[in-house]
Each structure stands twice: as structure tokens, then as C-alpha cells.
Amino acid sequence: QTASINIHNTVKLLEEDCTIPFISRYRKDTTGNLDEVQIEQIAKLQKEYEVIVKRKEAILKSIEEQNALTPELDKKIQQSFDLQELEDLYLPYKKKKRTKADVARENGLEPLAKIIMAQKNDDVDFLATQYLNDAIVNEESALQGAREIIAEWINENIYVRKQLRRLYERKATITTKVVKTKKDEADAQKFSQYFDWSEPLTKAPSHRLLAMLRAENEGFIKFKVEADIDEAYDVIDELVLKGQSPSTSHVQLAIEDSYKRLLQPAIANETLQEAKAKADANS
């Protein structure tokens, strides 16, 4: 109770534009003798909280404007105070460029995608013939379009994204390769140890990670963050596949497409940005 009051009082002083040294020295009675380090931490957490609240408001407004806000989704958004989780919840409603899945939906293939995703004993190859039209000229085109819709659903699955993030946090590898046309430049030589380098991201010290990123930024190396592809597929399979059925092979193809085209680039970039932020803080 007392700690909560002290934090509340400190936040109020910060909102009144009092500086951290001033609060620490002259408002000890109000803050319960908090020192500068503690006040700085409160200020940092308060800023993070404000960012989350603003983002939450913007997300709710956007989804409401699309008439897509269900009571269940509203509750999930209201209860979340994790920025990444909020972005995952918003992903299906985010305005984006026209995707392959959008084209497939326009061509009437969403019902076929739902049948395949249900993974029951339907003869999907036969059912695909019922979705032919001017744009979808054969069975394989219908199945391909349905798989593209499924790939987007998998990409937007909050549980898939969470589990892949965990995999990358634990097991991601950094790989660097020299850009051959730049290899012999004088300025490239200070980065020569990264011309062909690979190590677990968790083992890379901050100074090395930042040096690699500088080398990439200056165009001397290509930098990749990767996780074992089979482990990534296993993560998705466990959350998406429902055992063997005539649809299984189509869902597996959609999983592979979703991971390579959509999930892997996004999760790898997130993992790298997080690692860079930590490295910057430690440098």
C-alpha cells in the first residue's frame, strides 16, 4: 500500500515536470525516500505504460471503425499490457497492401480454405473443382489460392507468433557473409572477422553484435537471424495440424509458405531489433 502511494506520488511529480534530481533531493517525504535510480526506473516504466495505453486506444479505434470489434477481442485488448501481444491481436485488422490471400478471397476461395483448414475427411481435390471461374481456371489454382489464405491465417495466429518468438529467443543463430564486391575495400578489413561468421544470438556480446550491424550498414556484409527451419515447422505443426486427413498435405504446404514468406522475416526482424536495443543499452 505504502509503496503504491509512493509510486503514485512520484508519477505525479514527474507529470508536473519536476526533474529526477529535484524529486530525489527535495521531495523525499512525498516519495518515501526513493533514490534517483528508483525514480528513473519509475519514469521509464511510466513512459512505457503511456505508450501502451496510446497504442491500445489507436488499435481499438481502428478496429471499431472497421465494425470488427467483438466483445471477446475488446476484452483481450483491454486486458493486455504487452505491446507485442497488442500488435499480434491487431495484425488481422491492420491496413496493409493487397496480399495474395486478398486476391484469393476476391476469387471466392475462402470457403475452400475453411474446408481444408477444418482437416476433416473431405475430398478437397474434388471440392476444388467447384470453385473454378474466369480467374481460377483449374483445380491446382483453386488449391493454391486456398493455401495462400491459410498461410495468412497462420501468420496472424497469436499463439504461433508467440511460440516462434520463444524459439528465436532461445535458439536463433546470427550468420554473416561478406559482400564479395566489397571484400577487398580498405574500410572492409576492420570487419574481416565477420566475412564468414556464425554463432548463437544469445552468446553474441553487445560489442560484437553492434560491430556486425555497423558492417552490414556500411554494405560490407549480409546479416541474417535464423532458427532451425525444422524446429520452426514443428512449432507451427503442433498448433495447426489436427492429425492425418486428405487436407494435411495442403495445410503443410501452407505452413511452409507462411513461415518462409511471412513469419520468418517478421520474427527474425523483431528478434534482431530486440537484441540491438539490449546491445545499445549495454554499450
Question: PLM features: residue spans?
Answer:
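N-terminal acidic-hydrophobic amphipathic loop/helix motif that frequently occurs adjacent to catalytic
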Residues: Q1-T10, L45-I52
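Short coil/loop linkers at secondary-structure junctions
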Residues: T2-A3, T30, L69, E110
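N-terminal cofactor/phosphate-binding cores enriched in small/glycine residues
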Residues: A3-Y26, T30-V37
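Short hydrophobic/aromatic-rich motifs at helix boundaries and adjacent loops
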Residues: K28-G32, L45-Q46, E72-L73
